[in-house]
Design a protein with these regions (language model features):
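Active-site neighborhoods and metal-handling regions in enzymes and metal-associated proteins
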Residues: 1-269
Length: 269
């Protein structure tokens, strides 16, 4: 995403945090709906009900014509899966990406769920390492000089786990739009990246695969799949940077429970 980086006031960040906790609740409902025999449309409906009940709106529905409230991507589907009649089975990996808007301010977050709670050791390791990569990136943001410091932290975890970030798919700025400058790659890039500064709100979202980093888009013009059919995991949080620290906008505790192991204490905006 190119363009000017939108810097937020702390008051605006607080509205984004309201959107963020609605997204967190919607994803909790989606997680509970990821059971064997459920359709991906059922997962979407569970999240949509929470957003509607909270009086927020979906930022995915109608986005460039996207037909649902969430992206539900199963196994070899990396991101942007369209919810429908696909039936979930035990051992499936399901990533659910969801967003909400409150007073014009956006939240965006994603989780990966193992249907039925158990999967192969390789799949469990994939899901856990992708989650770890996200939190390593968030922790790095607390002290980062440039966006590239965040990218390096994410890629380091991926490398350790022998996983590959999907080429060309990156995190992004978020605020009055769901996708804004700057890009937040999940891998090191050449050249100088933007400097991290107070007022930035960023959606970090590692998308890691076991096999090749190459992807393709299906005929529905949305669903991104790994070219070799290997499974993928995807985790995402929206994070605010202000003068006194960082705050995970899509976690009710600001990310405190997960940042503790990194020695980072989030500070509310």
């Amino acid at each position: 995403v190119s363009g000017r980086i939108e810097l937020k006031t702390r008051e605006q960040m607080r509205v984004m945090a309201r959107a963020g906790v609605i997204v967190e609740r919607a994803l909790a409902a989606a997680r509970a709906a990821c059971v064997p025999g459920a359709r991906t449309a059922d997962v979407d409906a569970a999240a949509a009900a929470v957003i509607a009940e909270a009086g927020a709106t979906s930022n995915f529905l109608g986005y460039h014509g996207f037909p649902a409230t969430t992206c539900v991507s199963v196994n070899e589907e990396v991101v942007h899966g369209i919810p429908g009649d696909r039936v979930l089975a035990a051992g499936d990996l399901v990533s659910v990406d969801c967003g909400a808007v409150v007073e014009g301010w956006h939240g965006d977050s994603a989780i990966t769920v193992i249907v039925g709670g158990d999967a192969s050791r390789q799949d469990r390791a994939l899901v856990a390492a992708t989650d770890r990569a996200l939190w390593a990136g968030i922790a790095a943001l607390a002290t980062a000089d440039r966006i590239s410091d965040v990218s390096a932290a994410i890629e380091e975890v991926a490398d350790e786990a022998r996983l590959h970030p999907i080429d060309g798919y990156v995190g992004h700025g978020i605020g009055t739009q769901m996708h804004q400058a700057p890009d937040v790659p999940n891998y090191r890039t050449r050249g100088r990246s933007p400097r991290v500064r107070p007022g930035m709100c960023l959606a970090l979202e590692p998308m890691l695969v076991i096999g090749t980093d190459e992807s393709a888009i299906l005929n529905d013009e949305w669903t991104v799949v790994s070219v070799d059919g290997s499974r993928a995991a995807h985790w995402e949080h929206s994070v605010a940077v202000h003068e006194d620290g960082i705050w995970v906008l899509t976690a009710a505790d600001g990310g405190a429970s997960r940042l503790a192991e990194h020695g980072v204490v989030p500070v509310a905006p």
